[in-house]
């Protein structure tokens, strides 16, 4: 016969793990709680377990006897010594077996960590919990309690009322007065801090667990007790080793594993939080504090169990069945007097499942325990489900639907539903204004405070001290119509050949140069003259001090010349007119001067205030005179700046260099820009790694009016943006992110608003054909120029839609975007790599590469022309007169006709004209000459003509043949 481990455990009131451990200690190998154990092995285990319990079992049936009787039974030598040393009266009604039957108790009696709810009543037990005489296993005989852990006579309400014990059974750090207030024990019942080896530290405890008169050093004299509080028969580790206690709280008999090591158990073995029934059942629980029958997990693994052996989450009654356990006295907070206990039920009294005052005591316990926070293993009382939604929120001027829902702790769907009820169609990411948000929140019972906080996106301008201002070089912008010689003029000034390097011989982005004339520096900005570069010219005019307007003497004032004049006037910039190409025979400077007067520029020779200098860039004529005029105007303007401050300026141009990363050409307007400075331009920022001047030389600093190329930005800034030097990179990042978020919010606001009018417009737009384009260019300014030029090509029927524009080479990402959106890619001064080309061919994406902006515009124009619906034009081919009418069976009426002019073809459309009125228009059904079908009949011949679906042909009718010709439309 055999018995399973879990059955044996139930029989012995042990955990399966404890039984398995004990079986292994006697040489029986078992794998789990379902393993079978032979009867002889089970008997060996039973015998071994029952040996150390002789004394306890002898007195166990006498639980709850009156105080004097139990004292007589259990008083022993150890108890006597203690009584003598303490001089205290032994407390009654605690028999030895009642406190903690040790034989069959696999689990330690009390964890010592941070047990908030002590097990022992503090009221009548000032000196010691357990007599040590005949109770080798008892918890702690306390001066007046020789008979057990808890006096049962007067303590019906729990094992240890917690009068002045806020922190646990033996809270070891926060218990000022100890488990049992001892008068001279300020440090707690068993402080655990300095006690590595036992429940009661013996070395550093000046006051001891229970000051005993002649026992200054510990709870119990440790002479014969090297390892713990109470050496037990076969307990090698002591009563309660605390630090490295492999044996548990009070290992019993042959319990090598211990009940609960106290090292990592802050909350104690028996959390007292919500156990109204007391720590140990007092009535008929002869087998120990916790019946272990159904506990397949053994002793209670103590590893990472901070909450004690039994989680108290859902167990308001504690780990142990509380059926016949009178309610525990509620714990008290520090300073609260102990709650007086009613008399305990005596032997022979009828058991009640719970004390009749249980409900009242439970409420009292809740009230007393309310302020205590360190109760991790206490199950929280069931709380009412409350509405946690805030009643008051603070919102900005505008916010998204999702943000509003989050602030009100509501679902986004509820907010969207409210908006729909108000007639507002909104998505989760759509912004709504504060007024709408206030209405929505009001309907949901939330009050709203609107707080307008704009993120810092603008850096304050610092006023310069006039005493610190110094003269600076003038910034001169060269403007004019395309091919009028602006760059050639600059070449003549700089004695370089920039024009030769420009694609198509025209300037396609701003060039910034600095030259020195007579010891004075002048900064030149060369702007494009082509109509596509309006934005660039406007930027050039904004940052300049003087504008040189180049006009070809042989060409006169042209559209871009007029535009340049307007830009300069708008920026309030003085204009110097350079009449170029005077070396040509057909040049006529006077005509140019005359044309300029039409736009408000009257030259000095004619009594105006506009300086005009005739020059020849190729022949280098009058170049010095022009520069002298520039210096003269600059001197009159008294251009000054403070070089000793943080730099500010303008981004002239920006590009993405394959090796250097984002590169920006900047013009410093104030202060000095140094390598290592942190600059912020729009939503891009970074620390300057290197600076290069217009001649390609590396420089470490750049003063006012100096153009330099900077490296180190995190992204390509937009041309025309103002840059500032900031002290802190973190601050720069915050401002850049705020600007980027602001821009994104604006884009979302513009694209997500839906109304009936918008819907109608979009339906109409469905009839408009779109040419999607992706623009990639070498510099930011070229993208702008190309985009503006292409948008100007749009008509009411065909529209250019630039879906993406970026600086740098064409990448595979661009190809994928083009394939998804059915777009063509326009590359301006950039080339794709081999992989990108292969991907484009695979995806069937049309990639067009250009170096001259004219070509790009013309090609896009041609593509758009092909998308236009063609026009149809009617072309009359010939006329025939009906001379005779024939009625042919099964065919209908046929008109015998004579071709008057032109020709009649078989596939022509015809119209029948009678007396000058068109009476029918339709298809030609048959065309015959004699009895044969004819393809066409020319002038002067007769033929038979049958008209489809028309038989009312009469003599004298004129049949006119015509076709519709497709005519291509032009933009």
Curated annotation (Swiss-Prot):
Chain positions covered by the region annotation G4: 580-583
Positions annotated to bind GTP: 480-487, 526-530, 580-583
Domain of life according to the entry: Bacteria
Keyword flag Protein biosynthesis: yes
Region (G1): 480-487
Keyword GTP-binding annotated: yes
Sequence ranges of Polar residues compositional bias: 65-75
Annotated spans, G2: 505-509
Disulfide bridge positions per record: none
Full protein name: Translation initiation factor IF-2
Organism: Desulfitobacterium hafniense (strain Y51)
Record gene name: infB
């Amino acid at each position: 016969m055999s018995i399973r481990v879990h059955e044996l455990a139930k029989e012995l009131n042990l955990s399966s793990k404890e039984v398995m451990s004990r079986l292994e200690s006697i040489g029986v190998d078992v794998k789990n709680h379902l393993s079978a154990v032979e009867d002889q092995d089970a008997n060996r285990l039973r015998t071994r377990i029952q040996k150390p319990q002789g004394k306890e079992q002898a007195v166990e049936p006498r639980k709850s006897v009156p105080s004097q009787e139990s004292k007589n039974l259990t008083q022993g030598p150890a108890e006597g010594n203690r009584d003598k040393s303490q001089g205290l009266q032994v407390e009654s009604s605690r028999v030895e077996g009642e406190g903690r039957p040790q034989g069959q108790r696999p689990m330690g009696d009390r964890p010592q960590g941070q047990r908030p709810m002590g097990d022992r009543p503090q009221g009548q037990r000032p000196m010691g919990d357990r007599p040590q005489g005949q109770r080798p296993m008892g918890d702690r005989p306390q001066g007046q309690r020789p008979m057990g852990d808890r006096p049962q006579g007067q303590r019906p309400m729990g094992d240890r009322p917690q009068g002045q014990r806020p922190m646990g059974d033996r809270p070891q750090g926060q218990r000022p007065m100890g488990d049992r207030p001892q008068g001279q024990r300020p440090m707690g019942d068993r402080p655990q801090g300095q006690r590595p080896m036992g429940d009661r530290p013996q070395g550093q405890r000046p006051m001891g667990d229970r000051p005993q008169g002649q026992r200054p050093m510990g709870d119990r004299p440790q002479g014969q007790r090297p390892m713990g509080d109470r050496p037990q028969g076969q307990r090698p580790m002591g009563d309660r080793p605390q630090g490295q206690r492999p044996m548990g709280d009070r290992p019993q008999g042959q319990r090598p594993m211990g009940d609960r090591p106290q090292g990592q158990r802050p909350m104690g073995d028996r959390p007292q939080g919500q156990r109204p029934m007391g720590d140990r059942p007092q009535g008929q629980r002869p087998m120990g504090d916790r019946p272990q029958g159904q506990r397949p997990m053994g002793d209670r693994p103590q590893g990472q169990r901070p909450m004690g052996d039994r989680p108290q989450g859902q167990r308001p009654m504690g780990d142990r069945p509380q059926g016949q356990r009178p309610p525990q006295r509620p714990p008290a907070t520090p300073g609260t007097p102990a709650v007086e206990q009613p008399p305990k039920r005596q032997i022979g009294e009828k058991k009640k499942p719970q004390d009749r005052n249980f409900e009242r005591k439970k409420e009292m316990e809740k009230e007393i325990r309310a302020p205590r926070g360190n109760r991790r293993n206490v199950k929280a009382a069931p709380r009412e489900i409350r509405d946690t939604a805030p009643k008051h929120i603070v919102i900005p001027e505008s916010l998204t639907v999702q943000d509003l829902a989050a602030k009100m702790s509501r679902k986004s769907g509820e907010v969207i539903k409210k908006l729909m009820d108000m007639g507002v169609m909104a998505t989760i990411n759509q912004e709504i204004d504060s007024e709408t948000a206030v209405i929505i929140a009001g309907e949901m019972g939330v009050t709203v405070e609107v707080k307008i906080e704009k993120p810092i996106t603008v850096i304050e301008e610092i006023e310069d001290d006039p005493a610190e201002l110094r003269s600076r070089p003038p910034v001169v912008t060269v403007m004019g119509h395309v091919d009028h010689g602006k760059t050639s003029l600059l070449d003549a000034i700089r004695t370089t050949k920039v024009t030769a390097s420009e694609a198509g011989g025209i300037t396609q982005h701003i060039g910034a140069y600095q030259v020195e004339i007579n010891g004075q520096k002048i900064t030149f900005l060369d702007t494009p003259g082509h109509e596509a570069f309006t934005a660039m010219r406007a930027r050039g005019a904004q940052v300049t001090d003087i504008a040189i307007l180049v006009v070809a003497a042989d060409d006169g004032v042209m559209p871009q010349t007029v535009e340049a004049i307007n830009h300069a006037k708008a920026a309030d910039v003085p204009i110097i007119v350079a009449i170029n190409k005077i070396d040509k025979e057909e040049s006529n400077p006077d005509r140019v001067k005359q044309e300029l007067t039409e736009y408000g520029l009257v030259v000095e020779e004619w009594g105006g205030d506009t300086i005009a200098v005739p020059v020849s860039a190729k022949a280098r004529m009058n170049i010095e005179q022009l520069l002298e005029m520039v210096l003269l105007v600059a001197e009159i303007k008294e251009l000054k700046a403070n070089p000793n401050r943080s730099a500010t300026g303008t981004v002239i141009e920006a590009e993405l260099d394959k090796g250097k990363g984002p590169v920006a050409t900047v013009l410093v307007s104030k202060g000095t820009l140094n390598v290592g400075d942190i600059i912020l331009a729009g939503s891009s920022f970074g620390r300057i790694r290197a600076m290069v001047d217009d001649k390609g030389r590396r420089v470490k600093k750049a003063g006012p009016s100096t153009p330099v190329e900077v490296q180190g930005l995190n992204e390509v800034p937009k041309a025309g943006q103002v840059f500032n030097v900031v002290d802190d990179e973190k601050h720069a990042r915050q401002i850049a992110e705020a600007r980027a978020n602001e821009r994104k919010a604006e884009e979302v606001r513009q694209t997500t608003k839906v109304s009936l009018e918008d819907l109608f417009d979009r339906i109409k737009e469905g009839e408009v054909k779109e040419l999607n384009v992706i623009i990639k260019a070498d510099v930011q300014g070229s993208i702008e120029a190309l985009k503006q030029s292409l948008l100007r090509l749009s008509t009411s029927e065909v529209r250019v839609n630039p879906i993406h524009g970026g600086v740098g080479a064409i990448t595979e990402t661009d190809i994928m975007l083009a394939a998804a959106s059915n777009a063509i890619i326009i590359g301006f001064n950039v080339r794709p790599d081999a992989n990108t080309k292969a991907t484009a061919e695979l995806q069937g994406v049309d990639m067009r590469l250009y170096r001259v902006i004219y070509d790009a515009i013309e090609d896009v124009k041609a593509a758009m022309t092909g998308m236009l619906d063609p026009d149809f034009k009617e072309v009359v081919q010939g006329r025939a007169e009906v001379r005779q009418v024939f009625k042919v069976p099964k065919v209908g009426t046929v008109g015998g006709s004579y071709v008057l002019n032109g020709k009649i073809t078989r596939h022509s459309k015809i119209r029948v004209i009678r007396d000058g009125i068109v009476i029918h228009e339709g298809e030609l059904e048959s065309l015959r000459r004699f009895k044969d079908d004819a393809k066409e009949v020319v002038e002067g011949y007769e033929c038979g003509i049958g008209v489809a679906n028309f038989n009312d042909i009469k003599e004298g009718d004129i049949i006119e043949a015509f076709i519709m010709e497709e005519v291509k439309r032009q933009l």
